[in-house]
Amino acid sequence: MRKILLSEAIDDSGIRLLEGRVEIVFCPEPTEKAIGRLIKDADALIIRTAGSVTREMVEGAGRLKVISRTGGGLNNVDIEAATDYNIVVCGVKGPQDRMVAEHAVAFMGALAKQFFYLDAQVRKGNFASRKEYRPAGLSGKQVGLIGLGRIGRIVADICIRAFDMQVTAYDPYVTPETLGSDDIVLKEDMADVIQAADFLSLHVPLTENTKGLMGTAQFELMKPGAFLINTSRGEVVQEAALVDALKNKKIAGAGLDVFEDEPPDARNPLFELTNVIATPHSAALTKEVVAQLAKGSAENALNVLEGKKPSYSPNWDIVQAKLG
């Protein structure tokens, strides 16, 4: 019986799909050392956000045919190495998109209304805070989107339709012809989007081009009253530059679901700032979506083992061509 290694536990919907069809092996912890030790005898690996798959691990995995992610981001897998060894890398796209978009918009509302600050004041007995502070509204505000893929477009749709906000966007892979919307203003220069935004929301994958995308120069362009929203990947933002921008009031605040290092150190200076709202990379993790992602990743792994194309894979065609 073929063997599937799970780097972490997944929802029961995925387990039920695997049971009786493959031998399931659970990794004791999602570390490179633990995964690397057990991957040597596995035909497939299902991996979540924690842990990573390196070239060294792939080189030692003689039986491995597929690496299946419980999500769409594949930045914790060395895809080039996997392709060199004819291993299909696949992920699940779709179920999480709306949830991540909702999370980004919720950050906007919470930051503009200062829910967390005012909640703390009320709990302290400072009901007079209602006179001391004036939250902002969303209607008519400018939303800047960096990245206009599936999630970015949903964010734009919610902001425009629900809150009557104005949306500008930068995405080098989107043209006015492929945009298909008269409601979104597409800019050729990212700086134009950053400068105009009251809320700057990041929706890009982590690549060599997007790593460190937001640094000191970019924060200098933002309005002093603007907020940064990041539900994409932590390494897209240079955290030291963000801390400096927040402390020196170059921007008004930030809503962060992702961090440069995950899990972040509890002493991370971002957590000392009252104008930061942080969540634990949980934007997509609703009960329904977690089940769909687990099932989708299990289906992808089984399909590849049976010679069928997975729902999403950046290297399926390349591997199939190599195998003839």
What role is predicted for each listed range?
Residues 225, 231-324:
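Rossmann-like dinucleotide-binding domain for NAD(H)/NADP(H)
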Residues 52-58, 172-269:
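Rossmann-like adenosine-cofactor binding region
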Residues 148-149:
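Glycine-rich Rossmann-fold phosphate-binding loop(s) that bind the pyrophosphate
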Residues 85, 93-142, 154-162, 312-316:
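Phosphate-binding beta-alpha-beta segment of Rossmann-like dinucleotide-binding domains, i.e.
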Residues 1-90, 215, 221:
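An N-terminal-biased, well-structured beta-alpha scaffold segment characteristic
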